[in-house]
């Protein structure tokens, strides 16, 4: 079934003319309204934008589009032009896109979705296109902006108006390409409606966000929407993933070109693969020929992400040789298999792995490439107010793959950290785990126990610069704490 989420047939941009004033900017957050804006009062997941119409008008909104539902009526004291729009939340991105001149139409937009790998692939593609002379920006978990000049963000995929504003800003600043992480929440909540995607990339589907979606089936259906997007030219899909194979088989090749990739199968696959602490060496078969790729990126699962990038570059007109050459220059995204130490001290690896699949892949990778005789430590926890079903699963994975499992807090949010730890311990032999709820102390303990040749994986938070405890985000960086722990390690008698 073709999802026509970018150009709803019953939305007519000419309707905005009924407001009787020039429209240069729209805003869906009353706190960000500027004088002269048109305020989009949408019903949201946790709040109703119609409740903030008075606040938007006080800030100078010139007109209001409001969600026509639930018997809501415009109040006479709100003396401003207004227009009732059914399902405004679904149309907000489309309205913003038309007001801003359809910015994605002038860009090559690559959307990346899947449980794991979105951030790495989006960053690597932005780097690669930029190094190839095509100015590239990105929108995602670690930040928004041009590579090397990112601003922090609170959501993987921003709200629909912000998405369009960012695309318009990047177009104005000369971008040719935008790589965008597209979360299941973003698709389910219509945040990318109005975006014209050239290429969609699917990484994998493993357990995550079941607290929101309720089932893996619903989670998969959300991801699937991106690959039946109106006007999509290319779909790059992981054929090692069962859902990916099903997805690829359901796409009409007359509408969208499908290129699969994978470590075991796919149109783009390795004929040879060597993984070490120094990086990856691959000989890759592709529809465009065979090529050797050398990179400093670490880990077999990163080899799969690299193949996704190689395929995406090639379907967008980059020659195979140029694509392979530029991948050799790629640097890892912050908090994604990011290492510190090594050589004459333990190696500490910071990674965002916060799902069972991601944790298992990170541990398996490091177990494979660690020095002979070296031990593998795993410092990890599970987030509060999120799917509790994955907690014992992650405990079992840490016990299976790590020589020393160090159980600590992640972002407990409103939950009791000790209760989360008990949930994790239910999946493992508690006697084999070192428990330290204080994350900083846990990292210091693991590094202090480690020797030269040992590897310490600090998993779960990656790039994050905070820890959310009891609803308060306190400054915290796994990377900074790891550096401090290594400094202390070096000062030992």
From Swiss-Prot:
- Show the catalytic activity: UDP-N-acetyl-alpha-D-muramoyl-L-alanyl-D-glutamate + meso-2,6-diaminopimelate + ATP = UDP-N-acetyl-alpha-D-muramoyl-L-alanyl-gamma-D-glutamyl-meso-2,6-diaminopimelate + ADP + phosphate + H(+)
Compartmental location: Cytoplasm
Fetch the PANTHER family from UniProt. MUR LIGASE FAMILY MEMBER, UDP-N-ACETYLMURAMOYL-L-ALANYL-D-GLUTAMATE--2,6-DIAMINOPIMELATE LIGASE MURE HOMOLOG, CHLOROPLASTIC
Single GO term (MF) = ATP binding
Q: Which residues bind meso-2,6-diaminopimelate?
A: 386, 410-413, 460, 464
Q: Which cofactor does it need?
A: Mg(2+)
What keywords sit in the KW lines? Answer: ATP-binding, Cell cycle, Cell division, Cell shape, Cell wall biogenesis/degradation, Cytoplasm, Ligase, Magnesium, Nucleotide-binding, Peptidoglycan synthesis
Q: Per its UniProt record, what InterPro entries does this chain match?
A: Mur-like_cat_sf, Mur_ligase_C, Mur_ligase_C_dom_sf, Mur_ligase_cen, Mur_ligase_N, MurE/MurF_N, UDP-N-AcMur-Glu-dNH2Pim_ligase
Q: What kind of modification does the protein receive after translation?
A: Carboxylation is probably crucial for Mg(2+) binding and, consequently, for the gamma-phosphate positioning of ATP.
Q: What is its EC number?
A: 6.3.2.13
Record flagged with keyword Cell wall biogenesis/degradation: yes
NCBIfam families attached to this UniProt entry: murE, PRK00139.1-2, PRK00139.1-4
| UniProt binding sites for ATP | 114-120
Mark the residues carrying the PTM N6-carboxylysine: 223
Pathway listed: Cell wall biogenesis; peptidoglycan biosynthesis
This protein's name: UDP-N-acetylmuramoyl-L-alanyl-D-glutamate--2,6-diaminopimelate ligase
Q: Which GO terms describe its cellular component?
A: cytoplasm
Query: Which GO BP terms, alphabetically?
Result: cell division; cell wall organization; peptidoglycan biosynthetic process; regulation of cell shape
- Its main subcellular localisation, reduced to a broad class, is cytoplasm
Which of the seven top EC classes does this enzyme belong to? ligase
Q: Please tell me which stretches of this chain the record labels as motif Meso-diaminopimelate recognition motif.
A: 410-413
Could you tell me what this protein does?
Catalyzes the addition of meso-diaminopimelic acid to the nucleotide precursor UDP-N-acetylmuramoyl-L-alanyl-D-glutamate (UMAG) in the biosynthesis of bacterial cell-wall peptidoglycan.
| Similarity-based family | Belongs to the MurCDEF family. MurE subfamily.
- Where does the chain bind UDP-N-acetyl-alpha-D-muramoyl-L-alanyl-D-glutamate? 30, 156-157, 183, 189, 191
| Keyword Magnesium included in the entry's annotation | yes
Stored Gene3D superfamilies: Mur ligase, C-terminal domain, Mur-like, catalytic domain, MurE/MurF, N-terminal domain
What's the source species' lineage? Bacteria, Pseudomonadati, Pseudomonadota, Betaproteobacteria, Neisseriales
């Amino acid at each position: 079934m073709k999802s026509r989420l970018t150009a709803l047939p019953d939305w007519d941009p000419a309707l905005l003319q009924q407001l009787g004033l020039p429209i240069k900017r729209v805003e869906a957050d009353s706190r960000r309204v500027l004088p002269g804006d048109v305020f989009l009062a949408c019903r949201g997941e946790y709040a109703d934008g119609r409740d903030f119409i008075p606040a938007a008008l006080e800030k100078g909104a010139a007109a209001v589009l409001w969600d026509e539902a639930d018997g809501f009526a415009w109040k006479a004291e709100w003396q401003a032009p207004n227009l009732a729009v059914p399902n405004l939340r679904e149309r907000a991105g489309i309205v913003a896109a038309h007001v801003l001149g359809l910015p994605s139409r002038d860009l090559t937009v690559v959307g990346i979705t899947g449980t794991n790998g979105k951030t790495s692939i989006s960053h690597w593609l932005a780097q690669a296109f930029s190094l190839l002379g095509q100015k590239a920006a990105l929108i995602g978990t670690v930040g928004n902006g041009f590579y090397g000049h990112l601003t922090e963000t609170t959501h993987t995929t921003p709200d629909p108006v912000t998405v369009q504003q960012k695309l318009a800003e990047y177009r104005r600043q000369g971008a040719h390409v935008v790589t965008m992480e597209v979360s299941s929440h973003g698709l389910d909540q219509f945040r990318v409606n109005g975006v014209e995607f050239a290429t969609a990339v699917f990484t994998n589907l493993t357990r995550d966000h079941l607290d929101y979606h309720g089932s893996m089936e619903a989670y998969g259906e959300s991801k699937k929407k991106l690959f039946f997007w109106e006007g999509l030219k290319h779909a790059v899909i992981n054929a090692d993933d069962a859902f990916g194979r099903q997805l690829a088989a359901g796409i009409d090749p007359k509408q969208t070109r499908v290129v699969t990739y994978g470590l075991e199968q796919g149109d783009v696959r390795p004929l040879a693969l060597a993984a070490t602490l120094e990086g990856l060496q691959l000989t890759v078969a592709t529809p465009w020929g065979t090529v050797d790729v050398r990179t400093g990126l670490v880990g077999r699962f990163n080899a799969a992400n690299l193949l996704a990038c190689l395929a995406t570059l090639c379907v967008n007109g980059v020659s195979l040789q140029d694509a392979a050459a530029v991948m050799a220059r790629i640097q890892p995204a912050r908090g994604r298999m990011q290492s510190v130490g090594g050589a004459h001290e333990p190696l500490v690896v910071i990674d965002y792995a916060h799902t069972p699949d991601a944790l298992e892949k990170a541990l398996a990778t490091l177990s494979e490439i660690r020095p002979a005789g070296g031990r593998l430590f795993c410092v990890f926890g599970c987030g509060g107010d999120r799917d509790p079903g994955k907690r014992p699963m992650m405990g079992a994975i840490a016990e299976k793959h790590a020589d020393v499992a160090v159980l600590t807090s992640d972002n407990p949010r409103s939950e009791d950290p000790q209760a989360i730890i008990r949930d994790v311990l239910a999946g493992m032999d508690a006697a084999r785990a070192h428990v330290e709820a204080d994350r900083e102390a846990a990292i210091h303990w693991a590094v202090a126990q480690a020797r030269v040749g040992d590897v310490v994986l600090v998993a779960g938070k990656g790039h994050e610069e905070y820890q959310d405890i009891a609803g308060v985000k306190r400054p915290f960086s796994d990377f900074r704490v790891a550096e401090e722990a290594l400094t202390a390690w070096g000062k030992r008698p």
